[in-house]
Amino acid sequence: MLFPTSAQESSRGLPDANDLCLGLQSLSLTGWDRPWSTQDSDSSAQSSTHSVLSMLHNPLGNVLGKPPLSFLPLDPLGSDLVDKFPAPSVRGSRLDTRPILDSRSSSPSDSDTSGFSSGSDHLSDLISSLRISPPLPFLSLTGGGPRDPLKMGVGSRMDQEQAALAAVTPSPTSASKRWPGASVWPSWDLLEAPKDPFSIEREARLHRQAAAVNEATCTWSGQLPPRNYKNPIYSCKVFLGGVPWDITEAGLVNTFRVFGSLSVEWPGKDGKHPRCPPKGYVYLVFELEKSVRSLLQACSHDPLSPDGLSEYYFKMSSRRMRCKEVQVIPWVLADSNFVRSPSQRLNPSRTVFVGALHGMLNAEALAAILNDLFGGVVYAGIDTDKHKYPIGSGRVTFNNQRSYLKAVTAAFVEIKTTKFTKKVQIDPYLEDSLCHICSSQPGPFFCRDQVCFKYFCRSCWHWRHSMEGLRHHSPLMRNQKNRDSS
């Protein structure tokens, strides 16, 4: 019997240490099966003078004379308990503990941890409500020790009360569902920070690869316009496709240094595969343009191609492949731009960005394809890197708004030629612009949907696209490579 009944209380007073020991042993708790006298003779003598009320305000370890536990001080033991439990009444020199034991907290009455009840089950109910996993956070300053069941019980009850409060607190989303007829201001969603602060950037990056997962809305098939070059000037960078799988950078340099000094660029190369080309192709960057000419002269090619595009092949070997033909794709600088009407003024607002271009597609061919599909093409340009080699994207300008919108609406076009088949992606060409909503912040995000078709800053994007029916819009951003390209 842990607590005496009311009849016994008047004659015996508060329980002594032996009664508490028997009660705690009946709970089958670890560490309570030993007599208290084995801890310390001095501390056991002092512990018998403590009352049950002092145990509620102090850790059990202090009552037993044990070193203090290394828990963080919990404020609810001081202030929260005073608010939740009525203050004990003073009767002479004794404190009556029955009001505390009979009191209830403000948590639901059906809860197992809603407070203490009268009788000998008080501490047993409290112990049974403890949550062992996950434990309450604490700082161990002395290397660990026994946990305070009273503090853990109060912390468990506080967690349930906070969860109950969160369950009844209406959120903006639940408010809009509860009253569907009410007009909810779009800035409701702005009160909650997005889970990922770069979610717009992530969506914009994903959109750049949209051609790989979307179906083409229209198809162009035919023969590319012929190419006639007179003393062409090449980029110092060439594409090398179909290289041996076991080739190394040193092997490439040894093979091609006979044409001049060069370096090797391996797209996708990382520390896991430092020896082999991860994608089966590399780029060779020569110091001089004449080195590219010498390489092309050493290649086998077919100059009688119907479209005038010669395919160059070079034979090389590796450690495990004695002879392998690799394809060499150079780039003529004149293929980077095509102007149909030199006197026509180019309007950036009627310019589209074309991505996922094939390496054999030059500016003139791109202009011819989009002019056949949409009409009104006056300019086409291929984006290049610092070596003036294509990076797989381009720009096309129209002379009328109708053709421009038709191209933007098409979005994905499949190009079929005798040499290759490629699906390209068409988006509005983006410039540096202020936000079209607030006109005070830069607008790096563009919405290509015809309902919006504006530049947005981050805040205005979240505000605008929090409205129902606009959340599916995909953002566009300028690619950093396009900023550095010429």
UniProtKB/Swiss-Prot annotation:
Pfam families: CEBP1_N (PF16368), CEBP_ZZ (PF16366), RRM_7 (PF16367). GO terms for biological process: cellular response to amino acid stimulus; cellular response to hypoxia; cellular response to insulin stimulus; mRNA processing; negative regulation of cytoplasmic translation; regulation of mRNA 3'-end processing. InterPro entries: CEBP1_N (IPR032292), CEBP_ZZ (IPR032296), CEBP_ZZ_sf (IPR038446), CPEB (IPR034819), CPEB1_RRM1 (IPR034977), Nucleotide-bd_a/b_plait_sf (IPR012677), RBD_domain_sf (IPR035979), RRM_dom (IPR000504). Its main location: cytoplasm. Residues 102-120 have a biased composition (Low complexity). It is found in: Cytoplasm, P-body; Cytoplasmic granule; Synapse; Membrane. It comes from the Eukaryota. Zn(2+) 1 binds at C435, C438, C457, C460. The keyword Cytoplasm applies. The record marks W331 as: Important for the positionning of RRM1 relative to RRM2. Sequence-specific RNA-binding protein that regulates mRNA cytoplasmic polyadenylation and translation initiation during oocyte maturation, early development and at postsynapse sites of neurons. Binds to the cytoplasmic polyadenylation element (CPE), an uridine-rich sequence element (consensus sequence 5'-UUUUUAU-3') within the mRNA 3'-UTR. In absence of phosphorylation and in association with TACC3 is also involved as a repressor of translation of CPE-containing mRNA; a repression that is relieved by phosphorylation or degradation. Belongs to the RRM CPEB family. PANTHER family: CYTOPLASMIC POLYADENYLATION ELEMENT BINDING PROTEIN CPEB (PTHR12566), CYTOPLASMIC POLYADENYLATION ELEMENT-BINDING PROTEIN 1 (PTHR12566:SF9). This is Cytoplasmic polyadenylation element-binding protein 1. It comes from Pongo abelii. The gene is CPEB1.
